């Protein structure tokens, strides 16, 4: 499926899932590809740990994997550097993102299940009030 969706391979991958998804990406990622790992939701909640089978591609393709946890970088938010750097990129559409907004806190369980099951792409937002 990834070969069909990314016929030229993958250069950058933002990983929030880990497990089988990471394994598939390692097969498809291009030489010198970069992976930013910000979470491994597939490995949480007492699930059996998925053994990554394609680790050999990290060396064979010179892939870089970097872990990232936001609280290690709060100083950039607090001093305004993040906003000064990222906002112009968003305004010039040099950074693309997807978000899906749903209304009503009563719908949260349904959308959470759909999100975890991969039915949504991008950030899922539940709007509970107009501010």
Regions found by a protein language model. Give the residues of each.
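Terminal helix/beta-alpha structural elements that buttress the NAD(P)+-binding lobe
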Residues: 1-131
